[in-house]
Protein backbone atom coordinates (compact mmCIF):
# COMPACT_ATOMS: atom_id res chain seq x y z
CA UNK A 1 0.00 0.00 0.00
CA UNK A 2 2.87 2.35 0.82
CA UNK A 3 4.24 1.87 -2.70
CA UNK A 4 0.95 2.99 -4.26
CA UNK A 5 0.67 6.06 -2.02
CA UNK A 6 4.22 7.11 -2.91
CA UNK A 7 3.47 6.52 -6.62
CA UNK A 8 0.35 8.70 -6.31
CA UNK A 9 2.20 11.55 -4.58
CA UNK A 10 5.10 11.24 -7.01
CA UNK A 11 2.80 11.47 -10.05
CA UNK A 12 0.91 14.48 -8.65
CA UNK A 13 3.76 16.63 -7.38
CA UNK A 14 7.22 15.34 -8.31
CA UNK A 15 6.49 14.27 -11.91
CA UNK A 16 3.65 16.70 -12.67
CA UNK A 17 2.66 16.33 -16.33
CA UNK A 18 2.16 20.05 -16.91
CA UNK A 19 4.83 21.63 -14.73
CA UNK A 20 7.63 19.04 -14.77
CA UNK A 21 7.32 17.55 -18.25
CA UNK A 22 5.41 20.47 -19.86
CA UNK A 23 2.95 18.08 -21.50
CA UNK A 24 -0.50 19.23 -22.57
CA UNK A 25 0.49 22.89 -22.85
CA UNK A 26 -1.91 23.74 -25.71
CA UNK A 27 -5.09 23.17 -23.72
CA UNK A 28 -3.30 24.12 -20.49
CA UNK A 29 -2.71 27.68 -21.70
CA UNK A 30 -5.89 28.10 -23.75
CA UNK A 31 -8.48 26.89 -21.22
CA UNK A 32 -6.91 28.31 -18.05
CA UNK A 33 -8.73 31.66 -18.19
CA UNK A 34 -11.56 30.66 -15.80
CA UNK A 35 -11.35 28.34 -12.80
CA UNK A 36 -14.72 26.71 -13.52
CA UNK A 37 -13.82 25.75 -17.09
CA UNK A 38 -10.33 24.68 -16.03
CA UNK A 39 -11.75 22.46 -13.32
CA UNK A 40 -14.15 20.86 -15.82
CA UNK A 41 -11.36 20.15 -18.28
CA UNK A 42 -9.18 18.92 -15.42
CA UNK A 43 -11.85 16.44 -14.35
CA UNK A 44 -12.17 15.26 -17.97
CA UNK A 45 -8.38 14.75 -18.15
CA UNK A 46 -8.41 12.88 -14.80
CA UNK A 47 -11.17 10.57 -16.07
CA UNK A 48 -9.46 9.94 -19.42
CA UNK A 49 -6.03 9.33 -17.85
CA UNK A 50 -7.45 7.10 -15.10
CA UNK A 51 -9.14 4.92 -17.72
CA UNK A 52 -6.69 5.22 -20.65
CA UNK A 53 -3.50 4.26 -18.79
CA UNK A 54 -4.81 0.95 -17.34
CA UNK A 55 -6.75 0.03 -20.51
CA UNK A 56 -3.62 0.61 -22.59
CA UNK A 57 -1.67 -1.37 -19.99
CA UNK A 58 -3.93 -4.35 -20.65
CA UNK A 59 -3.71 -3.87 -24.42
CA UNK A 60 0.08 -3.62 -24.24
CA UNK A 61 0.61 -6.61 -21.93
CA UNK A 62 -1.97 -8.90 -23.52
CA UNK A 63 -1.54 -8.03 -27.20
CA UNK A 64 1.38 -5.77 -28.12
CA UNK A 65 4.21 -6.90 -25.86
CA UNK A 66 6.76 -9.34 -27.24
CA UNK A 67 5.54 -12.95 -26.87
CA UNK A 68 2.14 -11.78 -25.55
CA UNK A 69 -0.05 -13.40 -28.22
CA UNK A 70 2.29 -15.89 -29.87
CA UNK A 71 5.81 -16.92 -29.00
CA UNK A 72 8.30 -14.97 -31.11
CA UNK A 73 5.83 -12.30 -32.27
CA UNK A 74 6.50 -8.71 -31.24
CA UNK A 75 3.72 -6.21 -32.05
CA UNK A 76 5.24 -3.34 -30.08
CA UNK A 77 5.74 -1.42 -33.34
CA UNK A 78 1.95 -0.83 -33.18
CA UNK A 79 2.15 0.90 -29.77
CA UNK A 80 1.62 4.48 -30.91
CA UNK A 81 -1.30 3.89 -33.25
CA UNK A 82 -3.02 1.49 -30.85
CA UNK A 83 -2.63 3.77 -27.83
CA UNK A 84 -3.94 6.77 -29.78
CA UNK A 85 -6.91 4.71 -31.00
CA UNK A 86 -7.82 3.64 -27.46
CA UNK A 87 -7.45 7.22 -26.18
CA UNK A 88 -9.62 8.54 -29.05
CA UNK A 89 -12.35 6.00 -28.30
CA UNK A 90 -12.34 6.90 -24.60
CA UNK A 91 -12.52 10.63 -25.35
CA UNK A 92 -15.45 10.07 -27.73
CA UNK A 93 -17.31 8.17 -25.01
CA UNK A 94 -16.56 10.94 -22.49
CA UNK A 95 -17.70 13.57 -25.00
CA UNK A 96 -21.04 11.78 -25.50
CA UNK A 97 -21.55 11.50 -21.73
CA UNK A 98 -20.80 15.19 -21.16
CA UNK A 99 -23.06 16.23 -24.05
CA UNK A 100 -25.92 14.15 -22.66
CA UNK A 101 -25.63 14.79 -18.91
CA UNK A 102 -23.57 18.01 -18.52
CA UNK A 103 -24.42 20.31 -21.47
CA UNK A 104 -23.08 23.55 -19.88
CA UNK A 105 -19.66 21.97 -19.27
CA UNK A 106 -19.73 20.42 -22.74
CA UNK A 107 -20.42 23.84 -24.29
CA UNK A 108 -17.82 25.59 -22.10
CA UNK A 109 -15.07 23.16 -23.12
CA UNK A 110 -16.00 23.52 -26.79
CA UNK A 111 -13.25 22.43 -29.18
CA UNK A 112 -10.87 21.56 -26.34
CA UNK A 113 -12.77 18.42 -25.42
CA UNK A 114 -11.99 16.63 -28.71
CA UNK A 115 -8.45 17.98 -28.39
CA UNK A 116 -7.97 15.78 -25.30
CA UNK A 117 -7.54 13.00 -27.86
CA UNK A 118 -4.29 14.55 -29.04
CA UNK A 119 -3.33 16.06 -25.68
CA UNK A 120 0.23 14.90 -25.21
CA UNK A 121 -0.31 14.67 -21.43
CA UNK A 122 -2.64 11.71 -22.04
CA UNK A 123 -0.27 10.03 -24.47
CA UNK A 124 2.67 10.89 -22.19
CA UNK A 125 0.98 9.12 -19.28
CA UNK A 126 0.47 6.01 -21.39
CA UNK A 127 4.05 6.13 -22.72
CA UNK A 128 5.50 6.54 -19.22
CA UNK A 129 3.44 3.54 -18.08
CA UNK A 130 5.03 1.37 -20.79
CA UNK A 131 8.51 2.80 -20.26
CA UNK A 132 8.39 2.23 -16.48
CA UNK A 133 6.77 -1.21 -16.87
CA UNK A 134 3.90 -0.57 -14.43
CA UNK A 135 1.54 -3.43 -13.60
CA UNK A 136 -2.23 -2.94 -13.83
CA UNK A 137 -2.72 -1.60 -10.28
CA UNK A 138 0.25 0.76 -10.62
CA UNK A 139 -1.10 2.03 -13.94
CA UNK A 140 -4.48 2.86 -12.34
CA UNK A 141 -2.77 4.78 -9.53
CA UNK A 142 -0.35 6.48 -11.92
CA UNK A 143 -3.09 7.47 -14.37
CA UNK A 144 -5.22 8.94 -11.59
CA UNK A 145 -2.27 10.76 -10.01
CA UNK A 146 -1.04 12.17 -13.32
CA UNK A 147 -4.55 13.44 -14.06
CA UNK A 148 -4.93 15.01 -10.63
CA UNK A 149 -1.52 16.66 -10.98
CA UNK A 150 -2.46 18.14 -14.36
CA UNK A 151 -5.81 19.31 -12.97
CA UNK A 152 -4.11 20.86 -9.93
CA UNK A 153 -1.76 22.79 -12.20
CA UNK A 154 -4.44 24.09 -14.59
CA UNK A 155 -6.80 25.12 -11.77
CA UNK A 156 -3.96 26.90 -9.96
CA UNK A 157 -2.99 28.72 -13.15
CA UNK A 158 -6.62 29.68 -13.81
CA UNK A 159 -6.92 31.10 -10.29
CA UNK A 160 -3.77 33.15 -10.77
CA UNK A 161 -4.94 34.37 -14.20
CA UNK A 162 -8.30 35.42 -12.76
CA UNK A 163 -6.51 37.48 -10.10
CA UNK A 164 -4.14 38.95 -12.70
CA UNK A 165 -7.07 40.54 -14.53
CA UNK A 166 -7.00 43.20 -11.83
CA UNK A 167 -3.22 43.63 -11.87
CA UNK A 168 -1.26 46.33 -13.62
CA UNK A 169 0.61 44.14 -16.11
CA UNK A 170 3.01 45.97 -18.47
CA UNK A 171 1.51 46.30 -21.97
CA UNK A 172 4.16 44.11 -23.62
CA UNK A 173 3.41 41.20 -21.28
CA UNK A 174 -0.39 41.24 -21.33
CA UNK A 175 -2.07 38.02 -22.41
CA UNK A 176 0.13 35.00 -23.02
CA UNK A 177 3.37 36.80 -22.11
CA UNK A 178 2.57 37.07 -18.41
CA UNK A 179 0.96 33.61 -18.54
CA UNK A 180 4.22 32.04 -19.75
CA UNK A 181 6.12 33.80 -16.96
CA UNK A 182 3.54 32.59 -14.43
CA UNK A 183 3.76 29.00 -15.67
CA UNK A 184 7.55 29.19 -15.47
CA UNK A 185 7.38 30.39 -11.87
CA UNK A 186 4.89 27.64 -11.02
CA UNK A 187 7.23 25.09 -12.62
CA UNK A 188 10.09 26.42 -10.48
CA UNK A 189 7.89 25.87 -7.44
CA UNK A 190 7.19 22.29 -8.47
CA UNK A 191 10.92 21.74 -9.13
CA UNK A 192 11.40 21.97 -5.38
CA UNK A 193 9.73 18.56 -5.12
CA UNK A 194 12.27 16.95 -7.47
CA UNK A 195 14.69 16.11 -4.68
CA UNK A 196 12.06 14.28 -2.62
CA UNK A 197 12.68 10.54 -2.45
CA UNK A 198 9.63 8.33 -1.92
From Swiss-Prot:
GO terms for molecular function: oxidoreductase activity, acting on NAD(P)H, quinone or similar compound as acceptor. It catalyses: a ubiquinone + n Na(+)(in) + NADH + H(+) = a ubiquinol + n Na(+)(out) + NAD(+). The chain crosses the membrane at residues 11-31, 39-59, 77-97, 110-130, 140-160, 176-196. It is an enzyme of class 7 (translocase). InterPro entries: NqrDE/RnfAE, NqrDE/RnfAE_oxidrdctase, NqrE. It is found in: Cell inner membrane. The keyword Nucleotide-binding does not apply. Pfam families: Rnf-Nqr (PF02508). Keywords: Cell inner membrane, Cell membrane, Ion transport, Membrane, NAD, Sodium, Sodium transport, Translocase, Transmembrane, Transmembrane helix, Transport, Ubiquinone. It is a multi-pass membrane protein. Coiled coil: none annotated. Its EC number is 7.2.1.1. Its main location: membrane. The keyword rRNA processing does not apply. GO terms for biological process: respiratory electron transport chain; sodium ion transport. One of its GO terms (cellular component) is plasma membrane. Composed of six subunits; NqrA, NqrB, NqrC, NqrD, NqrE and NqrF. NCBIfam families: nqrE. NQR complex catalyzes the reduction of ubiquinone-1 to ubiquinol by two successive reactions, coupled with the transport of Na(+) ions from the cytoplasm to the periplasm. NqrA to NqrE are probably involved in the second step, the conversion of ubisemiquinone to ubiquinol. Belongs to the NqrDE/RnfAE family. This is Na(+)-translocating NADH-quinone reductase subunit E. It comes from Vibrio vulnificus (strain YJ016).
Amino acid sequence: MEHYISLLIKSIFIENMALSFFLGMCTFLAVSKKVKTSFGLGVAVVVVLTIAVPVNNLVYNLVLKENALVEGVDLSFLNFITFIGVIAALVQILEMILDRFFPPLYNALGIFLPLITVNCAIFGGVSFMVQRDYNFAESVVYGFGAGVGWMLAIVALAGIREKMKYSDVPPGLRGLGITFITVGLMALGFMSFSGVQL
